[in-house]
């Protein structure tokens, strides 16, 4: 009897494993990786708002002594990075790789050095950002900004230590519903997409009903810095839907 019980238990485990593998195989590898490494909830202690369905942004914090000086120092470092890596080929040689470029003129492409991006989860070196932002122009790729990152569960205090919340805008990509590998491209990308980073599906219930892969948080917190643009810290002028109480607005 004990042997039969053990055999039944073993078969049950095997079936469960096989089912998990089969389900995983329904989705592209990159979505499976996002699911594995992504966050399990989009809740955060950081005072934040939703912009559209898939982006969560920090609220402007109360100015603190030294914020302006810190921000200026970051801009100086970012400007030096852009000058050094003005030639995108040099960035590539130093380990920066383009993240899903479309080839569309005017697009902004993140060139990410994954070793440096991992290091940013522990400490920040403003002269070695995890990502450099290039804009595609008729003259080639133009270095226009840098991106610094923090863990997806970072607190407001941690974000503020890296770039002052009274000046910088931090964001996370949230509420992602991955589609099956057989999904037509227009279902995952473009204005009519249901799945993916810009899809109309943005709740767990709707994602499950559509047999999608629900990923509450994709990647961690990130902030873009454009040292030579009028809006160097980009984002404060974006239209957002609040997901936090009004009492948090001045925190």
Name the predicted role of every residue range:
Residues 1-4:
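Positively charged n-region of N-terminal signal peptides that target proteins for export
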Residues 8-18:
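Bacterial N-terminal signal peptides
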Residues 21-25:
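Boundary of Sec targeting at the N-terminus
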Residues 27-132, 137-251:
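Primary mode marks residue(s) on the alpha4-beta5-alpha5 output face of response regulator receiver
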């Amino acid at each position: 009897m004990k042997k039969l019980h053990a055999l039944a238990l073993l078969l049950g485990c095997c079936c469960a494993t096989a089912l998990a593998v089969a389900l995983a195989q329904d989705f592209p590898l990159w979505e499976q990786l996002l699911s594995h490494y992504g966050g399990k909830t989009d809740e955060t202690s950081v005072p934040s708002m939703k912009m559209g369905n898939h982006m969560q942004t920090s609220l402007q914090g109360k100015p603190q002594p030294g914020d302006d000086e810190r921000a200026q120092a970051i801009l100086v470092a970012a400007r030096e990075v852009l000058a050094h890596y003005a030639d995108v080929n040099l960035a590539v040689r130093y380990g920066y790789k383009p993240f899903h470029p479309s080839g569309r003129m005017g697009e902004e492409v993140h060139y990410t050095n994954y070793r440096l991006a991992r290091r940013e989860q522990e400490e920040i070196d403003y002269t070695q950002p995890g990502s450099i932002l290039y804009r595609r122009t008729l003259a080639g790729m133009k270095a226009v900004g840098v991106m610094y990152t923090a863990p997806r569960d970072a607190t407001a205090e941690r974000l503020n230590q890296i770039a002052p919340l009274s000046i910088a805008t931090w964001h996370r990509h949230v509420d992602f519903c991955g589609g099956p590998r057989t999904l037509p491209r227009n279902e995952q990308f473009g204005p009519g997409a249901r799945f993916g980073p810009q899809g109309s599906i943005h709740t767990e219930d709707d994602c499950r009903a559509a047999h999608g892969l629900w990923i509450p948080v994709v990647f961690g917190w990130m902030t873009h810095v454009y040292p030579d643009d009028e809006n160097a810290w980009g984002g404060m002028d974006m239209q957002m839907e609040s997901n936090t109480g009004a009492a948090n607005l001045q925190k």
